[in-house]
Amino acid sequence: MHTRTQPFTRAAVLAAAVLLVAPLSACGQIPFSGPMTTQTREIAEVDAVDLRTSGDLTITIGEEESLTITASAVAISALTSDVDEGTLVLDYGGGAFGVSRISYDLTVRSLDRVQVSGSGSVSGAGVLGPEGVVEITDSGSLALTDTHTRDLTVRIDGSGSVTLEGSSVSLDLMMDGSGDFSGEDLRTQKASASIAGSGSAWMFVTDTLRASVSGSGGLTYAGDPVQVATDVTGSGTVEIAAPR
């Protein structure tokens, strides 16, 4: 009796597993674990990047554009890397979603825009050109060093964080949510900041600062700017940084 039911039991378990995985696959909810693999993909004429996955993106400046992706063998087949009008969009295909660690290594000549639309992270040095835009629209993070721009725009919508080091003639910061901007090591001449929600920002400004805070957020600034204009509504604050 036991020997006859054992094959049936194994078959039943297998069938149950298939039934369990099938709806998950249909929804893209596949656990992307397993051995890691690396894949190189062709890209060309990239001047912006939008990271929409939970991966870690490292950007390097170089003459030859290239993209390398490291992830599990299952996950990597579902990852897309399309260039749309100069913007490299790093996403999941078909709504796929997983838990595998994803690493991107991107080499470009220069970028005008870096955007994080998911929970991923971006890092790089000397990435932006004379006019740069940095944007976070979720819970992701972005850290750029050796930044030297003429006009720099930073938008943080959500709980993400942006850290910038270097210099810019002008800086335009817009925040909505609980995000964080660390610009104490970004030397700017003219800066404007609009903070809505509970976010916090840190700036270094030497000439002119215009700041608007609504909600419970706060702006801290250093650099002893010549002109400062503030507009605060709610419990938010605009304050001078304590001497280091």
Question: Whereabouts are the PLM-identified features?
Answer:
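Acidic (Asp/Glu) and glycine-rich low-complexity loops/linkers
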Residues: 2-14, 20-135, 146-150, 155, ...
